[in-house]
Amino acid sequence: AQLGSMSAASWVGRGVLIEGDPKVAFGDATQPLDGEEKPSDSFSFLLSGDAETVTVTLTDDEGNAYTAQLKDVKSGVKTYTLDDLENFQPEPGPPQDREYTLSFEAKNPEGDNPEISGLIQEQVSGVTMTANGAVLHLLNHDPITMGDVVVIQK
């Protein structure tokens, strides 16, 4: 999709979802360091097909991992909050005073497992036009191409 320079300029300031490992925190658990954004308790992923279960793994900076499941998830871009996760293993679940990196696994009983990719939200801070098309410069991420964008937000 070739975008003209005028339409590319309209991307500046917009939020985009791109593939990556989302970070989350429970409620008011963590205070961000100066200049850093506070992690949200919501997360998104892209699912290529319907899944009976999506296993969400929360891993803290020390490598401690906790898993929970989402049931009967339809294909597409999905957004949940940590409150949607139940039955954490191991019990009693993750301490709520730290940040976690998420990873995902989708499964079906027939073994026909859809692809699943974590999504991270970034903000477009600038656009460069190159011979290969527009390059989006993001606030907290390396530059990406238009093709790397999964969802455009307002």
Task: Label every model-predicted segment.
Residues A1-K154:
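Type III/flagellar secretion export determinants
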